[in-house]
Amino acid sequence: MSPQTETKASAGFKAGVKDYKLTYYTPDYETKDTDILAAFRVTPQPGVPPEEAGAAVAAESSTGTWTTVWTDGLTSLDRYKGRCYHIESVVGEEDQFIAYVAYPLDLFEEGSVTNMFTSIVGNVFGFKALRALRLEDLRIPPAYSKTFQGPPHGIQVERDKLNKYGRPLLGCTIKPKLGLSAKNYGRAVYECLRGGLDFTKDDENVNSQPFMRWRDRFLFCAEAIYKAQAETGEIKGHYLNATAGTCEEMIKRAVFARELGVPIVMHDYLAGGFTANTSLAFYCRDNGLLLHIHRAMHAVIDRQKNHGMHFRVLAKALRMSGGDHIHAGTVVGKLEGEREMTLGFVDLLRDDFIEKDRSRGIFFTQDWVSMPGVLPVASGGIHVWHMPALTEIFGDDSVLQFGGGTLGHPWGNAPGAVANRVALEACVQARNEGRDLAREGNEIIREACKWSPELAAAC
């Protein structure tokens, strides 16, 4: 062996599996204001110490690989590596830990959720040293969030566009979700809008199938919107689903919606992908379209408690990528959603500044600086008896979306919409008069039933 080879070997370039904690576990590290911070729920394999597991997460989601490579000497690992800077046990779980990891800002491309997730929730989730791994929360520093456009318009601009203030907005998903012709679909939209709803919605499954091509649906829905607006004197909208198999086709559908003069389009942001979603958000801001976001596929990612990613992370990513509405659970309907946790990520969607609050699952203080907020959409198995609770829980800056709760009315779509609007107006008025919606909600609805036969029939 030559002296030169011996020197290289002694300098630390010997092949072999290495301990990650020697390089990537840094409990003395003081986080920087520009760091992206992550909280991972780590379940190590038996025999793997938590410090090694946390360091492995930091390494494999940043600069690390399983062995020392000679090109490590060509860059500054201290500048670019992720660092596991704190580990704590999960209460009630012997084998689970929260590992806090700090990432230098230079690891990520500006304005790209796709690039951020490729590192932070990439191959590390298949790492053999871990039985399970879940990303619980992210802290996005202003230095990074300012590289994103964010929502096309935001809450205040949407209210100004619609000229609707002081109450939640009302919506309805048209059912059956699949099988209607475009003309019958448009008729259902018209009946709901003329009855008092602000919005109707394409189901996320509706794209451009043989029974109803997208262009036909857009035309009949636009006709329904204009007719309902003329009759009610209110601005109406229908979430026209622009989701498509290619970005080019998606933008083509959004262009047609703009040409029809409708106010809003829709996108399935997880199924469609963050790159497509960000492209559509840019188009919507440039062309005055609101953007409704559906979260189809989220439960594949966020439902398991020890593996995947919490929805609060997906919600933060959506605010960065761009959307004016996003479905956020109901707390009271058919779909899963714990109240305090749900309100935690609802605040992350709407507010400018959110303090750390572990009781609500918020691991980091988040400052969105000037990024517009996103309206949370409550939908899934809700009806008029839920209206007091929904009004109290979600407040004015929300969209309450009743599918079966509107279309299932015994008298039809329009009376179902009337029932929802009357229930909402009654709850808002009662709240403004100082009544307790949580305690008096049922009584408020019963009182409103006396002067609204449509609401009485719905109850």
Curated annotation (Swiss-Prot):
Site feature: Transition state stabilizer: 334
Q: Sorted alphabetically, which Pfam families does this protein's record hold?
A: RuBisCO_large (PF00016), RuBisCO_large_N (PF02788)
Major location (coarse)? plastid
Residue list for modification N6,N6,N6-trimethyllysine: 14
Q: What is its EC number?
A: 4.1.1.39
The reply to whether Oxidoreductase figures as a keyword in the UniProt entry is yes
Keyword field: Acetylation, Calvin cycle, Carbon dioxide fixation, Chloroplast, Disulfide bond, Lyase, Magnesium, Metal-binding, Methylation, Monooxygenase, Oxidoreductase, Photorespiration, Photosynthesis, Plastid
For this entry, list what GO says about its biological process. Answer: photorespiration; reductive pentose-phosphate cycle
Cofactor binding, per record: Binds 1 Mg(2+) ion per subunit.
- Catalysed transformations (reactions): 2 (2R)-3-phosphoglycerate + 2 H(+) = D-ribulose 1,5-bisphosphate + CO2 + H2O; D-ribulose 1,5-bisphosphate + O2 = 2-phosphoglycolate + (2R)-3-phosphoglycerate + 2 H(+)
Question: Gene Ontology terms, cellular component aspect?
Answer: chloroplast
Locate the active site: 175 (proton acceptor), 294 (proton acceptor)
The enzyme class is lyase
Which residues bind substrate per the record? 123, 173, 177, 295, 327, 379
Q: Which domain of life is it from?
A: Eukaryota
Q: Which cofactor does it need?
A: Mg(2+)
Q: Which residues carry this modification: N-acetylproline?
A: 3
Q: Which residues bind Mg(2+)?
A: 201, 203-204
Q: Which PANTHER family match?
A: RIBULOSE BISPHOSPHATE CARBOXYLASE, RIBULOSE BISPHOSPHATE CARBOXYLASE LARGE CHAIN
What role does it play? RuBisCO catalyzes two reactions: the carboxylation of D-ribulose 1,5-bisphosphate, the primary event in carbon dioxide fixation, as well as the oxidative fragmentation of the pentose substrate in the photorespiration process. Both reactions occur simultaneously and in competition at the same active site.
Extra facts: The basic functional RuBisCO is composed of a large chain homodimer in a 'head-to-tail' conformation. In form I RuBisCO this homodimer is arranged in a barrel-like tetramer with the small subunits forming a tetrameric 'cap' on each end of the 'barrel'.
Kindly give the HAMAP family that the UniProt entry links to this protein.
Answer: RuBisCO_L_type1
| Family named by the database record | Belongs to the RuBisCO large chain family. Type I subfamily.
What is this protein identified as?
Ribulose bisphosphate carboxylase large chain
> Which organism was this protein described from?
Streptopus lanceolatus
Gene name, please? rbcL
